[in-house]
Amino acid sequence: MTPTQSAIETAQPRSRLYLCALVLLWLVIYVPGLFAPALFDDADSVHAEAAREILLRHDWVTLHADGIRYLEKAPLLYWTIAASFRVFGVQEWSARLPLALGVLATMLAVFALGRRAAGEKAGFYSALTLATSLGIYIFTRILIPDLLVGLWLTLSCYFFFRILEQQKPSRGACWGLAAAAALSVLTKGLIGLVFPAAIVFLYLLLTRDLRRLLRMRLLSSAAVFLLIAAPWHILAGIRNPAAGEARGFFWFYFVNEHFLRYLNQRVPRDYDTVPLLAFWALALVWLAPWCAFLPPSLARAPHRRRDFAHALDRQQRAGLLLAIWAAVILVFFSFSTRQEYYTIPALPALALLVGGWLAQESEGSPESPRLRRAGRMSALCLFTVGIIVFVATMGLLMLSKRPPAGAELADLLKRNPEQYALSLGHVFDLTPQALGWFRGELAIVGLGFLIGTGLAWHTRRRNLPGVSNAALALMMVAILFAVWLALQKFAPILGSKELAVAIQRVYRPGDVIVINGEYESGSTLNFYTGIPVRILHERSANLWYGSFFPDAPQVFETDASIARLWDGSTRVFLWTDVRDVPQLAAKPAFELAHSGGKYILTNRRD
């Protein structure tokens, strides 16, 4: 048996062991979140409702929400959710299943790229880093497509890395790159093409290898890309031409939702943007706790011009490619409007950088002593953060007060609606009284950080980096479990499922459901009841543009129209925030239900 054959036979069982460990980790962290909490108002339930209406209308081209055209998003996420609904029925868990499987697919893609670039241990540590990072978990609690963009970018870079290893790039590698870019376009729009194209071009430019582009089967790859990406765009344009006050699909989707959004000129202006410094800082927070190892990981990537002038080995090529990948995303959004989660597609690249470094640190290479010194320093910094987190959480526990008997969490929050355009805006609502609801979760986070980072530092001091990494991974399992528990307690604030269930119990055909505010503020009513709702608000947000088409249902109510409806013979269920109870007509209002600081009022007792 040759040494190569022996290495392959040894690697295969190790690879299976790594993959089994990763799948088990995914099951423990991500599967419980399929079933709880309930879907949230805004993007979570709006996107689930758009998928439900695909099946309701048998229309896989034009998305709808509340019966109105919903043209601002690319369709792939909605297609996967609709397919899940068709197979498993319309359920919370079936709505979340595609995104959870997307996490697993991204973990496996990261493993494959890391293994190809730096060996199986690097692939394993990279996928471990991704699976246990804070940002990936938080932003897959909501049905948004950014994680899937990270998946397609990982596959794009995997195929491009194969291209770099081939003197004459194969059809499979070139077409795989084109297909991944096309799927990314169908997931998030034009950035699905801009990101991989920029990464490939900048890499070849820096390494003075632009001639490789001519060998990348550009014509056939473009055909593959267009075959996948173009049909939906063409059909959407044909099915949604300019009509009435609406300027059609192409203007809204490409001009308004891509170019004007990037330039902060999009209409309507119903969004906020994260400050630039916070945006970059949050990219590190989302990689926590593994961001502590990012500085030495980045230091190993080629970063001087003279480095690019020489032939790079496999790990150097990977380091440069991954650094460019992360930089393209962070720099791109530095010049546009941005949300906290726009950095998510960069996290696989950062996880791969960290995973490759962790693998080298744990191996007995000549560089290991220097790497382990850097690892001990990073672990010490992390332990310092762990102490700070522990002290802060213990301080919050001391400040927190046990909630009064019978009190709701909503009663103890301080509302900050000006922050709600940000995805994590409700965090600013917490008060010392409200923190009393989260004493257990705070204890888990504080003790978890202290014990986990302390063990990580202690074991690295004893030259046991593998044990140290395991301690950090287990720490994150506990912390993410605490996040899941906290979200279940916060769910009545973030969603309106209990109110939808209360309506369903007494609903009769002909009754009318009205949301006092924007559609997104109570969109779970639409999803959980399966009944179109009306909106006591001017045209705005997700339904703004679609409402201008002549065939759009008249769902927007005015004060005058709601007064007539309220005083008529029709039974009306009015969703309203406790802060904004409207002045209704002559008939009295009766409370049907309340939850999370929101009420369902009705004009009839029966």
Regions found by a protein language model. Give the residues of each.
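Membrane-embedded architecture of ER/inner-membrane glycosylation machinery
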Residues: 2-7, 171, 175, 300-606
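Membrane-integral, polyisoprenol-dependent glycosyltransferases
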Residues: 2-370, 396-400
